[in-house]
From Swiss-Prot:
GO MF, any single term: tRNA (guanine(46)-N7)-methyltransferase activity
PROSITE patterns found in the cross-reference section: SAM_MT_TRMB
Annotated residues for binding of substrate: 148, 180, 217-220
Active-site residues from the entry: 144
Residues annotated as binding S-adenosyl-L-methionine: 69, 94, 121, 144
Region annotation (Interaction with RNA) ranges: 150-155
Protein name: tRNA (guanine-N(7)-)-methyltransferase
Catalytic activity, EC: 2.1.1.33
Domain of life per record: Bacteria
Keyword list, A-Z: Methyltransferase, S-adenosyl-L-methionine, Transferase, tRNA processing
Record-linked InterPro entries: SAM-dependent_MTases_sf (IPR029063), tRNA_(Gua-N-7)_MeTrfase_Trmb (IPR003358), tRNA_methyltr_TrmB_bact (IPR055361)
Length: 239
């Protein structure tokens, strides 16, 4: 069946023919605290990119459900979730090193042992390092919406990406997205609804209430005060 949702050009393996990145590298200046965290805590919690598949039990030293978060920003929500769910393991990916440093600092302060972080392009990590059928959940919160129509192709949520995520989820695993940009929420819903093997967990077949497991960010709180909406989508891998 032809899928009518617009996507960048991909080959038969789902890899981009020309790499369209969904992010812009804005490295920014590291604070002394972030620099200290990268130097001292990366050796313990950091994961270098490689072309070898990760062994999660070896990485975390135990067998436990694994959640992958893509684009964790400064890491406040990711650290809070890892702290609240010590029985689960978390891998966060972020391309901006100040955010990685901030996350490492917070995770160290909380004494977390169930969190690992990467500083790399998430699509490459998914292709090269995440084993199929290995993740309990994939989280994508507030990705860049690329507001202008001519930039919509840069949005990370496209059919090949959603198919790739599905292949990494276990059966029954969840892909959880959130955005504060309604046109992007509609785009996400269109993309996800077009793919065989996903089930929308919304009772109204569109959006779900924010689950208690997703912390409200400071950015989100400010948006609520200004009357801005937030849309959560949760899709389960069914086959």
């Amino acid at each position: 069946m032809k899928n009518d949702v617009i996507s960048p050009e991909f080959d038969e393996n789902g890899r981009p023919l020309r790499r369209i990145r969904s992010f812009v590298r804005r490295q920014g200046r590291l604070t002394k605290g972030q620099e200290h965290a990268l130097e001292n805590y990366w050796p313990v919690m950091g994961v270098e990119f490689s072309e070898d598949m990760l062994d999660f039990p070896a990485l975390f030293g135990r067998e436990a459900p694994v959640t992958l978060e893509i684009g964790f920003g400064m890491g406040a929500s990711l650290v809070a979730m890892a702290k609240d769910r010590p029985e689960q393991d978390f891998l966060g990916i972020e391309v901006h090193s100040p955010g990685v440093g901030a996350c490492l600092s917070s995770a160290h302060e909380e004494g977390l042992s169930n969190l690992r972080v990467m500083c790399h392009d998430a699509v490459e990590v998914l292709h090269k390092m995440i084993p199929d059928n290995s993740l309990r959940m994939v989280q994508l919160f507030f990705p860049d919406p690329w507001h202008k129509a001519r930039h919509n192709k840069r949005r990370i949520v496209q059919v090949p990406f959603a198919e790739l995520v599905k292949s990494k989820l276990q059966l029954g695993g969840i892909f959880h997205m959130a955005t504060d940009w309604e046109p992007y929420a509609e785009h996400m819903l269109e993309v996800m609804s077009s793919i065989d093997g996903y089930k929308n967990l919304s009772e109204s077949n569109d959006y779900v209430p924010r689950p208690a497991s997703r912390p409200v960010t400071k950015f989100e709180q400010r948006g609520h005060r200004l009357g801005h909406g937030v849309w959560d989508l949760m899709f389960e891998r069914m086959k």
